[in-house]
Amino acid sequence: AARLNDGRVMVYGSMGGDGQPQTQAALFTRYILQGVPLQESISRPRWLLGRTWGQSSDSLKLEGRFAPACIARLRELGHDVEVLADFSEAMGHAGAIVRHPNGLLEGATDPRSNGAAAGY
């Protein structure tokens, strides 16, 4: 959870073993620092460095929606890159809710899983 200087309160999380902190850091960075809309912050392509639940390799795993030039460049730099499905469950499932200062609740859910954001 995070209480921001502008009055927003954000709760967010993900499942996904050792990938959880990577997913949560990406989600927070996209939404708070880069100003990406909440749902898009969760839906954008993900990466995972190392092993996570159900995975046996320590490679750099990228969802297939990354640009081919990006994937090629990472390989040129010596990374062991493994390209997964466009929306891979190996990247975990994330969700977030933001309460804005005016009381508006904004929710987002992961297209990699079944779920919905609902509030009242």
PLM ranges: what are they?
Residues 1-87:
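Proteins synthesized as precursors that undergo proteolytic processing into mature forms
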Residues 65-120:
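Cofactor-centric catalytic regions
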